Amino acid sequence: MLKVEPIPAFQDNYIWAIHDGHCAAVVDPGEAAPVERFLAQSGLALGAIVITHHHGDHQGGVAGLLAAHPRAPSGGPLPVLGPAGERIGGRTQALREGDVATLEAPALTLRVLDVPGHTAGHIAYVADLGEAGPALFCGDTLFASGCGRLFEGTPAQMLASLDKLAALPGDTRVYCAHEYTRSNVRFARAVEPGNAALAAWEARVEALRATNQPTLPTTIAHERQVNPFLRSREPAVRAAVSAHGGTAADDAQNFGALRGWKDNFR
């Protein structure tokens, strides 16, 4: 049975390790040292590297990991998966929407989705983890109760990307790359103070973070209830954006105003 474990990195990153008890694929290793410690402590071999986008805190550890683990457990070159539309160091397989990547160690199939917005070529991976169910590895596109900043894409692109993710089965577990949940929930509460599900989630988040536990994974069904960026078309969210001074001629402009509000929220 496949398991997913977080490897904390930097101040608030999560590198996700997908493993079968013998070999691990690591998602978005921004630095190598935490991965090396995890592998040593867990007795796992590195089987693959999986990248969602080009930012350094997501691929900065690739060179170091390849230097230490040039070969996969099978003896061939270590697979490095990444978006076709971005520069990824050491990449062996360039992926885009509709591609399906198959790993041997661990045995894992990853379906690729294009999710531009945070960066122009950002991709996400949907995995069927067997008994553990479906999982989404979405980098900096969808966060718990939030979404990534628009560094390279447009509001319309990010809205379309989030719509695509929101359409996944509700039990899909969401593995994003940052522990931003506490600040995201504070903003979400400002947008929807009357959202009862969000109030309950805020209490849960505070309890988890008080003991330094991850708030991830969440699920797509949960995000539909508590994430303002998946709820941007809801009347209450639209009204809040308008009251904050946002203009909304269409859904994309409304989303852009919501994202701009978050960018300046303190």
From Swiss-Prot:
<dbReference type="InterPro" id="IPR050110">
    <property type="entry name" value="Glyoxalase_II_hydrolase"/>
</dbReference>
<feature type="binding site">
    <location>
        <position position="178"/>
    </location>
    <ligand>
        <name>Zn(2+) 2</name>
    </ligand>
</feature>
<comment type="subunit">
    <text>Monomer.</text>
</comment>
<feature type="binding site">
    <location>
        <position position="118"/>
    </location>
    <ligand>
        <name>Zn(2+) 1</name>
    </ligand>
</feature>
<feature type="binding site">
    <location>
        <position position="140"/>
    </location>
    <ligand>
        <name>Zn(2+) 2</name>
    </ligand>
</feature>
<comment type="function">
    <text>Thiolesterase that catalyzes the hydrolysis of S-D-lactoyl-glutathione to form glutathione and D-lactic acid.</text>
</comment>
<feature type="binding site">
    <location>
        <position position="140"/>
    </location>
    <ligand>
        <name>Zn(2+) 1</name>
    </ligand>
</feature>
<dbReference type="GO" id="GO:0019243">
    <property type="term" value="P:methylglyoxal catabolic process to D-lactate via S-lactoyl-glutathione"/>
</dbReference>
<keyword id="KW-0378">Hydrolase</keyword>
<dbReference type="Pfam" id="PF16123">
    <property type="entry name" value="HAGH_C"/>
</dbReference>
<comment type="similarity">
    <text>Belongs to the metallo-beta-lactamase superfamily. Glyoxalase II family.</text>
</comment>
<dbReference type="InterPro" id="IPR032282">
    <property type="entry name" value="HAGH_C"/>
</dbReference>
<feature type="binding site">
    <location>
        <position position="57"/>
    </location>
    <ligand>
        <name>Zn(2+) 2</name>
    </ligand>
</feature>
<dbReference type="InterPro" id="IPR001279">
    <property type="entry name" value="Metallo-B-lactamas"/>
</dbReference>
<comment type="pathway">
    <text>Secondary metabolite metabolism; methylglyoxal degradation; (R)-lactate from methylglyoxal: step 2/2.</text>
</comment>
<dbReference type="Pfam" id="PF00753">
    <property type="entry name" value="Lactamase_B"/>
</dbReference>
<dbReference type="InterPro" id="IPR036866">
    <property type="entry name" value="RibonucZ/Hydroxyglut_hydro"/>
</dbReference>
<dbReference type="InterPro" id="IPR017782">
    <property type="entry name" value="Hydroxyacylglutathione_Hdrlase"/>
</dbReference>
<protein>
    <recommendedName>
        <fullName>Hydroxyacylglutathione hydrolase</fullName>
        <ecNumber>3.1.2.6</ecNumber>
    </recommendedName>
</protein>
<keyword id="KW-0862">Zinc</keyword>
<keyword id="KW-0479">Metal-binding</keyword>
<dbReference type="GO" id="GO:0004416">
    <property type="term" value="F:hydroxyacylglutathione hydrolase activity"/>
</dbReference>
<feature type="binding site">
    <location>
        <position position="55"/>
    </location>
    <ligand>
        <name>Zn(2+) 1</name>
    </ligand>
</feature>
<dbReference type="GO" id="GO:0046872">
    <property type="term" value="F:metal ion binding"/>
</dbReference>
<dbReference type="InterPro" id="IPR035680">
    <property type="entry name" value="Clx_II_MBL"/>
</dbReference>
<feature type="binding site">
    <location>
        <position position="53"/>
    </location>
    <ligand>
        <name>Zn(2+) 1</name>
    </ligand>
</feature>
<feature type="binding site">
    <location>
        <position position="58"/>
    </location>
    <ligand>
        <name>Zn(2+) 2</name>
    </ligand>
</feature>
